[in-house]
Amino acid sequence: MISYQIVEHGKPLQRAVLETPKPEGTEVLMRITRAGVCHSDLHIWDGYFDLGGGRRFYVKERGCIPPFTLGHEPFGVVEALGKKAKGVKVGQKRLIFPWIGCGKCAVCKAGQDNYCVSGSRFLGVNRPGAYSTHVLVPDPKYLVDTTGIDDSFACTLACSAVTVYSAINKLPALGPKDEVAVLGCGGLGLVAISILRAKGMKNIVGCDIDDAKLTAALKQGAKRTVNTLAPDA
């Protein structure tokens, strides 16, 4: 298989020809057809997250040691199955949930693999990701049928969409007449507006410092917008 790897932080990704893994047990080999680029990928490529105030969080502390393959927004086609893999068939298209846990700790057993205390199996972070022709997935439970959604959009859902959906579900009970402010109208903010509308919210206020993004928020369904740099904001 072909992967594009970080060999040195801040330098162009390097093409690598690697052995295509063979799935065993419950494993599923996916042929990647779409891979989103998250802003976190850019931070990992840099080698650190800027925390502000001169502070940095270096990704090597999370096990991101070059060479490794980025990509935690994967979508692909089932290419091969281990003998114990059930529930999917070769040729089916699936979104791949990238936040893979150990499967043994309490949070994994509760179905919350993204909170896994091991933190060492996330695709594109500690495990080879989707900037590759193939990805090995440990279990079919991480594969999601997104029939009816464009593949190029579906690949982002297990990152940006679940982030926003989780935040919205933490809101207190709201009525249809209540206002909800969305702070920041970039990619996640626009997804937030879509989800809020789907949940019946009509009074959505988009807030940003970029007028172009505020225009996009109105097109997405915000009722009004606020430029937070404006004197009357």
Give, region by region, the residue ranges found by the protein language model.
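Short Gly/aromatic-enriched secondary-structure transition segments
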Residues: 43-50
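Adenosine-nucleotide cofactor-binding segment
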Residues: 179-185, 197-233
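Nucleotide donor/acceptor-binding cores
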Residues: 1, 92, 177-178, 202
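Hydrophobic/small residue at the entry helix of a nucleotide-binding pocket
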Residues: 163, 188, 196
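NAD(P)H dinucleotide-binding glycine-rich loop of Rossmann-like/cofactor-binding domains
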Residues: 58-72, 102-183
